[in-house]
Amino acid sequence: MTKVTPTSLADLIRRPIVTEKATLLLENNQYVFEVDPRATKPQIKAAIEELFEVKVTGISTSNMPIKKKRIGKFIGHKAQYKRATVTLAPEFTINLFPEV
């Protein structure tokens, strides 16, 4: 396992994923994040616990496939990314939607 410095922990977690399915998972205290494709589960756990000051009980990851994208006559593709579903201990929550 590679050594992770605190400055690189924030670079592992790219953004929270807010979809209908991810919103339903919030009821089970599960949060979905887009992470660096090279990140491992222990690195993701350390990053989430450090950034949000919570206790992680489980992580499942999946590599999302590359999808073709067509713009006019040109065919390109969307970048591949890794999705991590993080389960927190019952007493912890992450505030993804701060009050305005």
From Swiss-Prot:
GO terms for molecular function: rRNA binding; structural constituent of ribosome. Keywords: Ribonucleoprotein, Ribosomal protein, RNA-binding, rRNA-binding. GO terms for biological process: translation. InterPro entries: Nucleotide-bd_a/b_plait_sf, Ribosomal_uL23-like, Ribosomal_uL23/eL15/eS24_sf, Ribosomal_uL23_CS. GO terms for cellular component: ribonucleoprotein complex; ribosome. HAMAP family: Ribosomal_uL23_B. Part of the 50S ribosomal subunit. Contacts protein L29, and trigger factor when it is bound to the ribosome. One of the early assembly proteins it binds 23S rRNA. One of the proteins that surrounds the polypeptide exit tunnel on the outside of the ribosome. Forms the main docking site for trigger factor binding to the ribosome. This is Large ribosomal subunit protein uL23. The gene is rplW.
